[in-house]
Amino acid sequence: VAEQGKHAPVLLILGQRGWQAERVFEQLDRPEELQGHVQELGTCNDEELAGWIGGARALLMPSFAEGFGLPVFEALELGTPVIASDLPVFREVGGGIPTYLDPQDSAAWKRTIEAFCADGPERQRQVAEIGAFQAPTWGDHFAKVEVWLARL
C-alpha cells in the first residue's frame, strides 16, 4: 500500500482471527494506512463464501501450520488460483496446481501477488490446470489408510 497507493490490490480476510498471529493483527489494525485495501469478514454463509472465493484473483494461504487445508481445496474446486505456503498438507490437497512459497519469504509473496494481479504466466498456468483438479474423496483417503494399516 505504501508503494502502490490507491492501485494496491484489496486483501479480503475471510474467517475468524487465528491464534498466535498477534503481530499480523497489529499491522491490520492500522485502518488509516490500510483503509480500503484490507477488509475482514469474520463470518459468512456457505453461499457467500463460495462467491468471495470464486470471485477472487487468488486465494492466499501464508500459513505456518495447517490441519487439512480446506480453503485450498475449496478454491481449486471453484476455479480460483492458489498461492500457499509450501506445507505438505497443501501439496497433498492441491498437488502441482498451487504456487508454493516459503511463508517467511515476504519478498517472494509480494512479487507473486503482484504477478497474479497482472495475470502473469504463473496465474495463467494455474487457470489452465485447474480444470483437471481432482478433489480427494473419502474413498481415496480410506484406500491410503488401508494400505498403511496393512503394513502394520
Sequence positions of predicted segments:
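Nucleotide-activated donor-binding/catalytic signature segment of Leloir-type glycosyltransferases, i.e.
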Residues: 15, 22-50
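Short glycine-rich donor-binding/catalytic loop of glycosyltransferases
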Residues: 64, 80-94, 103-105
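A charged, aromatic-enriched C-terminal amphipathic alpha-helix characteristic of glycosyltransferases
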Residues: 121-152
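Short beta-strand segments
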Residues: 10-16, 39-42, 62-63, 84, ...
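Acidic donor-binding loop of glycosyltransferase active sites
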Residues: 52-70, 78-81
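Conserved acidic donor-binding segment of nucleotide-sugar-dependent glycosyltransferases
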Residues: 99-107, 114-120
